[in-house]
C-alpha cells in the first residue's frame, strides 16, 4: 500500500479538480490509500461523488488554505501548522504518508517543505525536478526553479539526486547525465558549470554516467537521461518549451480550420491528431519532484485538470514505490564517503 | 542602394548555399549591391550560375576561410586581416559596406567583429539579438549568447539596444520591453534582474515602455516586443524553443504517416500543412544581429539553406535601411545625458 497525502485545496480549481484526479489515480492503482487535507464544506460535495475514493481515504478538516497568490513568507506565517498545504507535508514527516502531493503555489510549497522536512544530510539546497517528454521517451531536468545560481558542488548534488530519480523512475542502472550549457566555446562566465563538469568527471560515480555538456536543443531530443542546471535557466527552459508547444498547437489549430479541404483532412486524420494531442498534452506529464528533503513532495501544475492531478499523484506513487529517497541517501553517502577521508583515530 | 558584404565561405555548406541565398535576396530587393569575400576557385562555379548577381557584386578573393570548428582565439590568430570572415566585417569598418553577413562560426564571428569594429561608446559588451516568431508576429530577444552573466547596467544597455532594433524592424514608436525572469516570488539570487527592473522603471525612457518581468512562456505568446536577458539563459531559451519545435514536427510527421486514413487526411490538408511548415521553418526567421558594435554584423545559422541565408541578408538589409546603429547611438546618448549630470564649470 502506498500512502499519499493530498492537499485538496491546491491549484487554480481546488477540490473540484483535485478530488476527481485522485479518483482517476486510484482507479489505475488500487494499492493507493489517501490522506486528504481540505476545508470540509468545500470538499464534501465532490467527495460524495466518489464513494470508492471516500472509502480508501481519511479526511482531515483544516483551518485554512494557502492561496495561489500568497508570497512564500506570508504563506508560511499564516499557514504553518494549520493549512491544508502544511498538514499534507507534515503527514510525510510524521510517517502518516509516503509522499505528499499539492497543486498549490510553488513558492509556498517549497518554503513549507523546506521548513517542515528540512534538507537531507550533505544537501545544502533542494531542487525541483521535472519529467521532460523527449523523442526517445522521457528525461529528468533539474533544477527548474528552486535554487537560483547554484555553485559547482550544488550542481554535483543535483546530478546525484537526478541520477537516483532516473533509476527510480526509468528503471535503468546507470543513467546518463548532461550539464546544460551554451554551445559557444571559450565563453566567459558560468565557471560553476565547467567546474561541475570537472567534479563529475573526476568523481567517476558508479550510479551514473557523465556525458558532458548538452545544449537547449538536446532537451527535446532526449540526448541524456538527466539534464542538470541551476534553477534560473532550468525554469526558463521549462517554460519556454511549454510556451513553444502551445504556440505550435495554436498554429496547427489555425491551419486545420482555415479551409474546407483542411477540415476534411482533419476528419480523416483525426486519430492521428488525437495521438499528437496526447503527446503535446502537458497534463500527461505533470508532477515536479522536490529533491533533497527528508521526504518526497510532488508539485502539480496549478492549472492542471483532473488528468494532470492524477499524473502528479502517479509520479509520487512511482517515487515512493521505488524508494526514491532511500536511493538518494545511499548515493550521497557513497559519494561523500569516497570524497572525504575518514576522520578519527583510524585516520591518524 | 544598400551595400552588403557577404562571407561566401560561412556555414555548413559554404558558397554552394550562400551564393543562391544572395541571389534570392537580390531578386526580392533589387536595391542591394554585394561585396563578396570568398575563395575564388570554390566560388566561381556557383557565381557563374547567377549572372544577374554577378553583375550586382564585387568579388574579393581571400587567402583563407575560418572553419566551423575553430575556436574564436584560434580563428582570430589565423584569420585576422586575411580570412573571408574578417574581410567581410572590415568592409563595414572601412565604409565599403553598410552591413556584414556571415553564416560562419558564431564565436569566431563575434571575436572578429569585436576586435575589428570595437564596441560603441557607453557599451561595455555586445549582444546577439534574435528575431523570435510569436503568436502575435515577431519579438526581439537579446542576448542569446554573446555575454554570459550580464549585470544590471548591461541589461539596461541591452534594453536600449533592443528597443532601437524593434523601432527599426517593426516600425513602432515605443516598443514594450520585458525582463526575462522566473515566476516564483521572493526567490534568492538574480539580483541583477531586479536591479535592472528598477533602473528601467526609474529611467523612464521616451523610446521604450518597460512592461516588467516576463517568463519563458511569454516568449512564444509575444507578450512584449523586446525580451531582455543575459546570454546564458537567452541561449538556452532559444535552443530549447528550436528543439521543441523540431520535436513536435517529428511527432506530427510520425502521427501523419502512421495510418492510411491519416495519410489521406494529410493529402486533403496539404496546403494547411504547408502553411504550418512555413510557420515552423527556422530558415524563415534567420539572422542574429550583433548589437553594440560600431557597425552591423548579421549572423546566419550555420545550417541555413539558401532561403535561410536570404532571410539573414534581408534582416541586414532592413537594419541598414532603417539606420539601426544611428538609432542605437541616439538612444544611448539621450539616456546617458539624462543619467550623468553635466561636468565642468556650469555644474559647479
Swiss-Prot record, chains A, B:
UniProt main location, coarse: cytoplasm
Matching Gene3D superfamilies: Isopropylmalate Dehydrogenase
Enzyme class of the recorded protein, top EC level: transferase
Catalyzed reactions: a fatty acyl-[ACP] + phosphate = an acyl phosphate + holo-[ACP]
Listed InterPro entries: FA_synthesis, Phospholipid_synth_PlsX-like
Highest taxon of the lineage: Bacteria
GO terms assigned for molecular function: phosphate:acyl-[acyl carrier protein] acyltransferase activity
Entry GO terms, CC: cytoplasm
A biological-process GO annotation: phospholipid biosynthetic process
Function text: Catalyzes the reversible formation of acyl-phosphate (acyl-PO(4)) from acyl-[acyl-carrier-protein] (acyl-ACP). This enzyme utilizes acyl-ACP as fatty acyl donor, but not acyl-CoA.
Family named by the database record: Belongs to the PlsX family.
Protein name, UniProt field: Phosphate acyltransferase
Taxonomic lineage from the root: Bacteria, Pseudomonadati, Pseudomonadota, Alphaproteobacteria, Hyphomicrobiales
